[in-house]
Curated annotation (Swiss-Prot):
Pfam families: Carboxyl_trans. This is Acetyl-coenzyme A carboxylase carboxyl transferase subunit beta. The gene is accD. Component of the acetyl coenzyme A carboxylase (ACC) complex. Biotin carboxylase (BC) catalyzes the carboxylation of biotin on its carrier protein (BCCP) and then the CO(2) group is transferred by the transcarboxylase to acetyl-CoA to form malonyl-CoA. NCBIfam families: accD (TIGR00515). Acetyl-CoA carboxylase is a heterohexamer composed of biotin carboxyl carrier protein (AccB), biotin carboxylase (AccC) and two subunits each of ACCase subunit alpha (AccA) and ACCase subunit beta (AccD). Its EC number is 2.1.3.15. Binds 1 zinc ion per subunit. Its cofactor is Zn(2+). Pathway: Lipid metabolism; malonyl-CoA biosynthesis; malonyl-CoA from acetyl-CoA: step 1/1. Coiled coil: none annotated. PROSITE patterns: COA_CT_NTER.
Length: 288
């Protein structure tokens, strides 16, 4: 009877594996790094349109850049002399997988640690320079980061140099426990000695600058300038809201909010930072 006859097979909508493989061979692949999505305006941007400064052409958002990219944008070509590359962590807590994580970060960034330190010329002005890189374990501050920055200040005192630091950090490095927290006091003491010597210290806040770095040397500069829209704070927004039981302003912990309340002296476009650094260092008795 027709009523109980076998139904025809359903039409296949999804191609089987053989069809998939034949189709995929004929479709050109788009390279992974050809486009970037802006975290602010959500637009897809052709990488070449970002330019060397990595700024969104639609909303002017400043993408996070590596220490090497920052260096190329800032210093006179060929003038940078890297220092303190021989310092290594002793891994005092023998934290599980810490050494593997360090090795992975070194391979990914080309850096030995989360901060690049040395001396350089910026438009002819000689200075001691530190650049933190958030791509290296979120530029967390451990014993090596603290020691390198402390030695940079000590060298600057001996050679009568101004210090310029580009800050970026997720805070203290948990894998080193109390030793990482101690770096806050150690670096702050070095900043004070540099200040007592009558030398200029400029901090440039970049996205993100949080935790122990914010609570110490990031906010201790003689002048504090920042890149637009950078996130700067100590504790996270949700932690603060839970503690105070209040809703915070939408722009809370953005540098524009901090400038409005007197915590930041100026907000400077990334493309203008080189000129601003040279001007401020020269104005405060820089060394050429």
């Amino acid at each position: 009877m027709a009523l109980f006859s076998k139904k025809d097979k359903y039409i296949r909508i999804t191609p089987n594996n053989s069809l998939k493989s034949s189709v995929s061979r004929n479709v050109p692949e788009v390279p992974d790094e050809l486009f970037a999505k802006c975290p602010a305006c959500k637009h897809m941007i052709y990488q070449k349109d970002l330019g060397p400064a990595k700024i969104c052409p639609t909303c002017s958002y400043n993408f996070r850049i590596s220490a090497q990219e920052r260096l190329a944008l800032t210093v006179d070509e060929g003038s940078f002399q890297e220092l303190f590359t021989d310092i290594e962590t002793k891994d005092p807590l023998r934290f599980p997988d810490y050494q593997a994580k360090l090795q992975k970060a070194r391979q990914a960034t080309g850096l030995h640690e989360a901060v690049l330190t040395g001396t350089a010329l910026v438009k002819g002005q000689r200075l001691a320079l530190a650049i933190m890189d958030s791509h290296f374990i979120m530029a967390s501050m451990g014993t090596v980061v603290g020691e390198k920055i402390t030695r940079l200040f000590e060298l600057a005192i001996n050679e009568r140099l101004p210090v310029v630091i580009f800050t970026a950090s997720g805070g203290a490095r948990m894998q080193e426990g109390i030793m990482s927290l101690m770096q806050m006091a150690k670096v702050s003491a070095a900043v004070k000695r540099h200040s007592n010597a009558g030398l200029f210290y400029l901090t440039i806040l970049t996205d993100p600058t949080t935790g122990g770095v914010t609570a110490s040397f990031a906010m201790e500069g003689d002048m504090i300038i920042a890149e637009p829209q950078s996130l700067v704070g100590f504790a996270g927004r949700r932690v603060i809201e839970t503690t105070v039981r209040e809703n915070l302003p939408d722009d809370f912990q953005k540098v524009e909010f901090l400038k409005e309340h007197g915590f930041v002296d100026a907000i400077v476009k990334r493309t203008d930072l080189r000129d601003k650094i040279a001007h401020l260092v020269a104005f405060h008795g820089g060394v050429s």
